[in-house]
């Protein structure tokens, strides 16, 4: 999993510019593994902590900009609204266009969750099944690639947390 990436917009701020301005601008999502407000009203989360540590390393304040969707992360970054993204994003070919990803900090696997008793062994076993996938997730891109080999493969994209 990749947590930080920098924009390739015209006004990229490198470490020197960030230090001069005194603030690291970070885009993120409200998510239990990324950035959220706990019961004490504190903002916490693994990627939030990593971004805050990077800001400390630079000797600057950190400003978090929370958006609702992965698409908004990419669009806001491309528009220069932030210096980087900290949101547990999976790197895909489509997502790599126009941005630079950091080295991965964690490897994750894509899994299919089925009802008890159903155990697909290969992508062809998914043909004819009702598949639901979260909007904006890397699963959509994977399914689009699998559809080239299995044209009858279909799925529905759903909104909300996935």
Where are these regions (language model features)?
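Sec-dependent bacterial lipoprotein signal peptides
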Residues: 1-6
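Bacterial signal peptide processing site
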Residues: 8-11
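Nucleotide/pyrophosphate-binding catalytic subdomain
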Residues: 14
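Short glycine-rich His-centered loop
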Residues: 21-45
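Loop/turn elements at helix/coil->beta-strand transitions in domains of secreted/extracellular proteins
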Residues: 23-24, 60-61, 81-83, 128-129, ...
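Acidic, polar ligand-binding/catalytic clefts
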Residues: 33, 48, 52, 56-125, ...
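Ligand-binding cleft/hinge of the Venus flytrap
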Residues: 36-39, 48-61, 102-103, 139-161
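Pocket-lining segment of extracytoplasmic ligand-binding domains
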Residues: 111-162
């Amino acid at each position: 999993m990749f947590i930080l990436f920098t924009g390739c917009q015209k006004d990229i701020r490198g470490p020197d510019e960030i230090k001069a301005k005194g603030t690291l601008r970070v885009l993120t999502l409200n998510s239990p593994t990324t950035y959220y407000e706990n019961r004490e009203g504190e903002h916490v989360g693994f990627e939030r902590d990593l971004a805050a540590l990077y800001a400390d390393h630079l000797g600057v304040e950190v400003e978090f900009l929370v958006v609702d969707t992965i698409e908004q992360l990419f669009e806001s970054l491309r528009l220069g609204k932030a210096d980087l993204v900290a949101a547990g994003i999976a790197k895909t070919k489509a997502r790599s266009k126009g941005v630079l990803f950091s080295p991965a900090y964690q490897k994750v696997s894509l899994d299919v969750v089925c009802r008890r008793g159903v155990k697909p062994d290969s992508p062809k076993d998914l043909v004819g099944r009702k598949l639901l996938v979260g909007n904006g997730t890397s699963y959509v891109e994977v399914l689009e690639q699998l559809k080239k080999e299995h044209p009858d493969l279909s799925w529905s994209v759903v909104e909300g947390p996935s």
